Amino acid sequence: MGNRGMEDLIPLVNRLQDAFSAIGQNADLDLPQIAVVGGQSAGKSSVLENFVGRDFLPRGSGIVTRRPLVLQLVNSTTEYAEFLHCKGKKFTDFEEVRLEIEAETDRVTGTNKGISPVPINLRVYSPHVLNLTLVDLPGMTKVPVGDQPPDIEFQIRDMLMQFVTKENCLILAVSPANSDLANSDALKIAKEVDPQGQRTIGVITKLDLMDEGTDARDVLENKLLPLRRGYIGVVNRSQKDIDGKKDITAALAAERKFFLSHPSYRHLADRMGTPYLQKVLNQQLTNHIRDTLPGLRNKLQSQLLSIEKEVDEYKNFRPDDPARKTKALLQMVQQFAVDFEKRIEGSGDQIDTYELSGGARINRIFHERFPFELVKMEFDEKELRREISYAIKNIHGIRTGLFTPDMAFETIVKKQVKKIREPCLKCVDMVISELISTVRQCTKKLQQYPRLREEMERIVTTHIREREGRTKEQVMLLIDIELAYMNTNHEDFIGFANAQQRSNQMNKKKTSGNQDEILVIRKGWLTINNIGIMKGGSKEYWFVLTAENLSWYKDDEEKEKKYMLSVDNLKLRDVEKGFMSSKHIFALFNTEQRNVYKDYRQLELACETQEEVDSWKASFLRAGVYPERVGDKEKASETEENGSDSFMHSMDPQLERQVETIRNLVDSYMAIVNKTVRDLMPKTIMHLMINNTKEFIFSELLANLYSCGDQNTLMEESAEQAQRRDEMLRMYHALKEALSIIGDINTTTVSTPMPPPVDDSWLQVQSVPAGRRSPTSSPTPQRRAPAVPPARPGSRGPAPGPPPAGSALGGAPPVPSRPGASPDPFGPPPQVPSRPNRAPPGVPSLGAWRLNSPQGKHENRAGKARL
């Protein structure tokens, strides 16, 4: 390793894993570890048991590992195990460890083969292990059993992906030697998440269970199916050995004997077996941790910074002792009052750019929604004239009137003024709704104190409801005042003498087309929604609304005018949204049943939000475009059908002049009333409702809270908030401790360099067999080339039968190469004769293809020269 500090890297990661496992998944740290993946019954758990030297993992048929097991091996003088979920309890009997794993698995997954991604953390202290951190994962399977869901294959795959996709996770791909390696589930998933092979280590199990005459030598030499980090072979205990109580110490000795005695593996014996695998994994994991420490430190620091902000908020709002609760309550009430005032009055700091504040919404109600509601009550022209004619006739009675009666004017005006009550009361209701919404927005900061938040909302809302009655009484009083006296001497009232003149002036204005003053009321983007697909579909244009017309342009530069529409005889109506449309639509139509735009009876205009629609409607009101009344069509049809009630055909010229005079007078006086109401309503609501509520919050809210009872009850935190605060504080301290520990580690040691890349394109080929079972790499001896006998002999001697064609040495015995001169990089030390550079003609380990190839002929000539 180079220094003691580097040897402590793996225990450091173990401590980090324990710390962050204890506080839950919120840490989301990519800690360095080794994930053991493989198919079902590939021998993953047996490899881990060999590491520990004890039987401690559940065994059986089918899927046995049903939850991830985070196994932390720690080199120690004493031997025992600890579970994270059983803190303080030491397990010295490893049979109890097995039972605890099974019991903990069943607690989460059930007893009938269910799986769960929640890991079990097990730490094993032993003098027989090296420092390692491994994760034993469920074996990949295809067919569900027991109560497993039909998608068990994908659930297990998703669980594996949670571990192996992390860049800091080494992948221990376990594959049995007695199955096709190219179809290995472990290597497939490793290739998918680690295409460069930088994190994958291959392990070949069940070498002793291969068919007689076959071996996996070329695979273990990393020649046939190469991996960048290579392969390591191990021999686990068979089920017979386990049933016979063969301990792992004896199994490791048998494994060592197997590699030393097997003719295909003895030259690799020093690089095979469980002890060597454990050593390699320790070295690789340590180097991997060293390489990933800088990134881990940066991630810890960034998480610490984000947590510090939240922890500071908890410090500001968390009273830890009863003496501070009163002070904290006072601070929160003051903060609530300030927030409420800022949302109503507006503020230059911390401006919300995503939605309108309460004050801005109330402003829209005062100056857009309320005027629109007033005009929606606009009287129908024909109905109004009919009512005026009836009033004049009824006032005259049996007599024929010579003058226009002013009582008809007063009767009609009072009837119209009474209609204003409904929009005024609706305006109060809308403002109250916005005030209550603003109160709830301001109390969001108190969500960690649910009792205080609930009580504060109740007190303020109750006060608003109390002021609602007082405000509505005052509004009704304003309407009654208007009804009490008709001020026909008002400076804005045209009077009887000017009524006829005004009618004549309006007619002249229409004919002359007054172009001297054109007031632009509104500009903005709108979408024409009802253009057919054949004509281009819906398009967005820049609209300009004036008192005379509505124009739209290609863009907001207003250079290319598309169309101009006069606002005379136009009205508004709402249009329902389409099935797939998210826009809000309103339409313009002509009251004289004419086409509005080209061959369209109505012009449908679309906005992104309902607020924009309301704002445009208010702008159209200023231009004299009023909304369609619900009963317009019905009343018009009734009037046409009822000929006796139609005054259009029965009015004499004198009555018609009188009706027109009264009509102008009513129009003039109602304009004065509407102007007065539009001016007084915001003032009344501000004085009686909004300002009064602000004053109540500043002066009386705290006293009302104190009168509710025990302040300690009000200041009780919610269980969820207390738990979250405790979790964040634990994580905060864990992150600080982790950064402190990492800062003390010396990471200057030179690690083993990464092996060079290899050609691993074989992983994409599904027909390559598992190991070097035969010279032709066939999975079964029956598929050998016909020129070579099918079975491998038990020794390195010549095989029976005639020598293959092209053999230069015939049946000569094998000639060992000189010590130290072998080109085989996997050979043993020089004092032991290395593997022959060339094979006798009957040895199928090299194959007839090598002897027939130019390379084989070159080796034959080299052998003759040495002889």
Curated annotation (Swiss-Prot):
Chain segments annotated as transmembrane: none
Residues covered by region (G3 motif): 136-139
EC number from the UniProt entry: 3.6.5.5
Ranges for region G5 motif: 235-238
Residue span(s) of domain Dynamin-type G: 28-294
PTM sites of type Omega-N-methylarginine: R796
Residues modified to 3'-nitrotyrosine: Y125
Gene Ontology CC terms, in alphabetical order: cell projection; chromaffin granule; clathrin-coated pit; endocytic vesicle; glutamatergic synapse; membrane coat; microtubule; myelin sheath
Modified residues (Phosphotyrosine): Y80, Y125, Y354
Span list, region G1 motif: 38-45
Modified residues (Phosphoserine): S306, S347, S512, S774, S778, S822
Family matches, as InterPro entries: Dynamin, Dynamin_GTPase, Dynamin_GTPase_CS, Dynamin_N, Dynamin_stalk, G_DYNAMIN_dom, GED, GED_dom
Domain PH: 515-625
Domain GED: 659-750
Domain notes: The dynamin-type G mediates homodimerization and plays a role in self-assembly. The C-terminal proline-rich domain (PRD) mediates interaction with SH3-binding partners. Is required for DNM1 self-assembly.
Protein name: Dynamin-1
Gene name, Swiss-Prot/TrEMBL: Dnm1
